[in-house]
A protein has these predicted regions:
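Extracellular/periplasmic, surface-exposed regions of secreted and cell-surface proteins
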Residues: 1-153, 330-423
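Extracytoplasmic gating/loop element in the C-terminal half of outer-membrane beta-barrel translocons
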Residues: 209-211, 235, 272-366, 371-372
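C-terminal extracellular loops and terminal segments
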Residues: 83-92, 134-150, 237, 243-253, ...
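Extracellular/surface-associated beta-sandwich interaction domains
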Residues: 33, 96, 137, 155-156, ...
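Conserved small-residue
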Residues: 1, 9-10, 103-242, 305, ...
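Small-side-chain secondary-structure face that scaffolds active or pore-lining regions
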Residues: 56, 60-94, 111, 218-220, ...
């Protein structure tokens, strides 16, 4: 956390035609920055039954992170620099973990062992950089906003896609236009057929950008007849509400193992019960950047047309490299459901009897085959996104995959076979 100067080359040339080196304004640093403190309270119970064959463990914890280093509250742009980070944040996380295990060997020699666990936790910001700001004026876009649950996603609740029958048509077969008054300004939009129309003119320009059949229709939560983001504050969220949370919830795992007369088998499951994100990039957002030409098959086969009115995705549109815009505002319908169940490993092995090995001076030999990450069950509607690795990264900071959902290195599937020998 030292104040540094960013270096680079200006657009000015010296007498030899070379670009002149330059240094940027030094970053601001809080002179009183210090270590953050973590306090943890934990209660646990560990029980064993049936001659130690069955066990249950339960833990409940509360973790307080105090004086956490987070960005300061936004300062006027006339300052000329970003607000410095400092010890402005405090979090409280509450969670629990339950695990159980069982092992037994039957009289016929069959042995089984089972382990399972599930855990959950949620975090609330007890103090953010905006703690002095009145509650009603705190921005919905602030990650560490005082009193808010960490990871909450604010957006619109999607009703459905507009259909042709939602609009009024003239004698020429074209949708009729009308003038509505929005925030004291006359706005041109398409006339709706509903007795109680809800207009979305906040995101229209009255010309090319007008909500039409195939575009997303949002729910008017505040009942004023318009879809708006308000001031995007706690006190005036408009029609925005919490539509999801990025924190993984209900993380679970399950392992089953068995062995019998030299054969052994194990299978390991892992998953997350609940998690939502608003994606970024061509794999997550339909129409993200049409000029790139790269998009999943799911988008090309399930977008709205007059012949496919029950499609999941809206009519084709080019967002010009943005993950929000026009009909593709942050909304419940197109949040990515990152819950999943993955079979992480399946192993089958056979241990050769020792009476056979003794003849060739080997004390133990085992052959095995193992499958890694071969089977995944998710709710991503066929999108090629790994729910365990969601963010892309580019070493060149290019616009192709920097921060884009699903474009990072995926979890690889692998099949391996081997022989383990002990002499």
């Amino acid at each position: 956390y030292k104040s540094i100067l960013s270096d680079g080359q200006s657009s000015w040339l010296d007498g030899s035609g070379n670009k002149i080196p330059m240094f940027g304004t030094p970053s601001l640093v809080d002179s009183d920055i210090s270590w953050q403190q973590i306090e943890t309270l934990d209660f646990g119970i560990d029980l064993r039954f049936f001659n130690n064959k069955f066990g249950v463990t339960f833990d409940w914890f509360q973790r307080d992170t105090k004086n956490m280093i987070i960005p300061g509250e936004s300062l006027p742009v006339t300052l000329g620099a970003a607000a410095p980070s400092g010890n402005y944040g405090s979090l409280r996380t509450k969670g629990w973990e339950l695990s159980a295990d069982f092992n037994h060997r039957f009289a016929n020699g069959l042995g089984i062992n089972i382990t399972a666990s599930i855990s959950d936790a949620s975090t609330f910001i007890t103090k953010g950089a905006d703690y002095l700001t009145p509650w009603e004026d705190r921005s919905l876009g602030t990650t560490y906003s005082t009193g808010r649950r960490y990871g909450d996603i604010y957006g619109f609740v999607t009703d459905r896609l507009f259909q042709k029958e939602d609009f009024v048509y003239g004698a020429d077969g074209q949708i009729e236009k009308i003038i509505v008054i929005y925030n004291g300004t006359a706005r041109t939009t398409y006339k709706q057929s509903s007795e109680y129309p809800v207009y979305q003119v906040h995101y229209e320009d009255g010309n090319k950008l007008i909500f039409s059949p195939g575009d997303t229709k949002f729910v008017d939560l505040d009942g004023d007849g318009y879809i708006t983001p308000g001031t995007s504050t706690n006190g005036n969220p408009g029609d925005q509400t919490v539509i999801g949370n990025t924190t993984p919830r209900y993380e679970y795992s399950f392992r089953l193992g068995a062995d019998y007369k030299g054969f052994d088998f194990s299978i390991y499951f892992q998953g997350i019960g609940k998690r939502k994100i608003w994606g970024n990039g061509q794999l997550a957002i339909p129409g993200y950047n049409a000029k790139e030409g790269a998009l999943p098959k799911t988008f090309t086969t399930d977008y709205w047309t007059e012949e496919r009115t029950n499609a999941f995705y809206p009519r084709a549109w080019d967002l010009g490299g943005s993950n929000t815009g026009f009909a593709m505002q942050k909304q419940s319908r197109y949040l990515l459901d990152m819950s999943y169940l993955r079979i992480k490993n399946i192993t089958l092995g056979y241990t050769v009897p020792t009476n056979i090995l003794s003849k060739i001076y080997i004390s133990k030999a085992r052959v095995y085959m193992s499958l890694e990450n071969f089977f995944t069950f998710d709710n991503l509607r066929g999108l090629p996104i790994d729910p365990e690795a969601i963010s892309g990264y580019s070493m060149f900071s290019t616009n192709y995959n920097l921060g884009r959902t699903g474009t990072g290195t995926p979890v690889f599937k692998s099949l391996s076979c081997g022989v383990q020998l002990t002499f």
